[in-house]
Amino acid sequence: MGHWPESKPLKMQEFIVELQPRIKTFEMGGETFTLETGRIARQATGAVLVSTGDTAVLGTVVGAKEPKPGQGFFPLTVNYQEKTYAAGKIPGGFFKREGRPSEKETLTSRLIDRPIRPLFPNGYMNEVQVVLTVMSASKNHDPDIAAMIAASAALAISGIPFDGPIGAARVGYTNEKGYFLNPTFEELSTSLLDMVVAGTDEAVLMVESEAKGLTEDQMLGAVLFGHQEMQTAITAIKEFAAENGKPRWEWQPEAENTELLNAIKAEFGGAIEEAYAIRDKMARYERLGEIKSAAVEKLAGEEEGQPSEEEVKKYFGKVEKSVVRLQVIEGKPRIDGRDNKTVRPIKVEVGVLPSVHGSALFTRGETQAIVTATLGTTRDVQIIDALEGERKDPFLFHYNFPPYSVGEAGRMGSPGRREIGHGRLAKRGVAAVMPTIEEFPYAIRAVSEITESNGSSSMASVCGSSLALMDAGVPLKAPVAGIAMGLVKEGDKFAVLTDILGDEDHLGDMDFKVAGTKEGVTALQMDIKIQGITDEIMEIALEQANAARLHILDEMNKVIAEPRAELSDRAPSITTIKIHPDKIRDVIGKGGATIRGICDETGASIDLDDDGNVKIYADNAAAAQAAVNRVKEITAEIEVGAIYKGRVERIVDFGAFVNILPGKDGLVHISQISERRIENVTDELSEGQEVLVKVLDVDNRGRVKLSMKEVKEGEQPTDFAD
């Protein structure tokens, strides 16, 4: 029988993991920021932990060295995620773990994507994924600025071709303090401005903001202030990358096929220019499709040296872009024949849907939105479980962009990132003029259905929502309108375009959206695709946008200039009354019997708080008033001299006990039943009989003396509805 060979004792080798963090700190807006790499996520292409106060965000980037075969676009993805453990919480729900991205996570992912995307070189097709994970969260500051800095720093040290870094800053404003950096949540609640600015050391690339009617000069000042203050972050990231960054990858853009470019210009440039003179979008697209097909048929081939179909289409697009941009720079009419400052024709209708609480159809050229406003009770408010704590939002805004709006068949389903982002921008535009929940105790939902789109559907949603809300009777502080601006810049020449088309957005260098009232700006969003946008250009764009906004408001005001005085008959009726806190138990009753009885009797719903505030919800005003009357009856104090309609509860030899309020009886003495002498109470009264009585007295023990004979003919009982 064989034996296993004798095993030799293994030598235990001690492995030591060396974690050597490299750290840099800088100050911005009175806060200390720390950049750290080399300790966490070392297998990522680049990883930086950014800390400030109690906030810590891990930024990682992974990039592919080579593009996927046939890749025709830049596959950049940005994922911002908030872990509930960062705030010392356990996720709610059955599964007790984070699930699909929240709206806040989606919006912040877009916020980070927008300024970094234009800084990758043209033609770069390698996959890049940026992941920002909030690992510790302060209850005072939003972690989005730390996340933007983390993304910038991770890209800066990764070696991936990236023309950054960027910095980011949040700017607040009050009349007393002026502009200030890094506002807390508490400071934002009283600030007239909430603006996030991002950019490089030379240029602003992205602005996202909401304001409470600031002027164009104040908004521009905030942009410049934020850009100036973020320079400390940009300098720190540059120094951090110089000390800790990997060598920049060797990457060269694909050599331009000038022969093909010139061939398309020569053969089809004139036809493309003629096609862009067609005013109708669908007809223009059809003609451009025909020209493109002809170019592919003539120039593409499978033989050696011939360009592929995809290559011909790519260079055809470049010729399209150059044709349109040259026309704009030379001052020629735009694609639809307008000059640079003219707004497309506007058509406004309200009350277009009979069953909804408020509705509007807003059409501007080939962009159209049907917007509805629905009123609900405070039970319908959105409950947001954020890292900084739970809060309630009574104003909901949802934006839908179905594929038919651009003449296409496509995916239908839950909203994508773009729809969520556009909805939030439109909501920012009208939020400043919305009433508070105390002023108007309703939950409000606005829904924008984009039915046609050719540029700036989000700003059409702003206009449409303002109209629909006023149609519903929501007491807006002022009407709001929005406009999208564009820019074409070639060298030192530039043209600012008012009310851009979809093609102008795609082919231009800037997307600049402004919403506001006649008095000032309520929202500003800016995305810039190139370097070199000067203060002068931004100032001109804001001035031009102001003129366009006032024009649109004038057109809207011709149809409806102020909220309707009455709510829709279909809207729920909400009434708020105040009772003494000691009376709450009377309204609730034993085991809730009284309040349930009121609800069953009237069809209303009732909410009470500890301060004695009673909110009554009903489908119509009559049901609400009936419930109000019942609550007032229950909580009313008996008034001497008042007349009540009561019910005889019990008859005794010396009189009758009459119930005049819920749970409150009084005695009508036999001598107070009639002017004439009565021998037997039962000769005049019977149990269950309804009678009018007047209160003569309430003694210090709460005993109530009533009289029937003191009620004069024609007198009516006290009206508790008043």
Swiss-Prot record:
EC number: 2.7.7.8
Top enzyme category: transferase
Keywords for this protein: Cytoplasm, Magnesium, Metal-binding, Nucleotidyltransferase, RNA-binding, Transferase
Taxonomy, superkingdom: Bacteria
Coiled-coil stretches: none
Compartmental location: Cytoplasm
Domain spans labelled S1 motif: 641-709
Nucleus recorded as keyword: no
GO molecular function: 3'-5'-RNA exonuclease activity; magnesium ion binding; polyribonucleotide nucleotidyltransferase activity; RNA binding
Cofactor(s), names only, from the UniProt record: Mg(2+)
UniProt GO BP: mRNA catabolic process; RNA processing
A Pfam family that the UniProt record links to this protein: RNase_PH
Annotated residues for binding of Mg(2+): 505, 511
GO CC annotation terms, alphabetical: cytosol
Segments forming domain KH: 572-631
UniProt family annotation: Belongs to the polyribonucleotide nucleotidyltransferase family.
Known function: Involved in mRNA degradation. Catalyzes the phosphorolysis of single-stranded polyribonucleotides processively in the 3'- to 5'-direction.
Subunit text: Component of the RNA degradosome, which is a multiprotein complex involved in RNA processing and mRNA degradation.
Record's protein name: Polyribonucleotide nucleotidyltransferase
Protein species of origin: Marinobacter nauticus (strain ATCC 700491 / DSM 11845 / VT8)
Gene: pnp
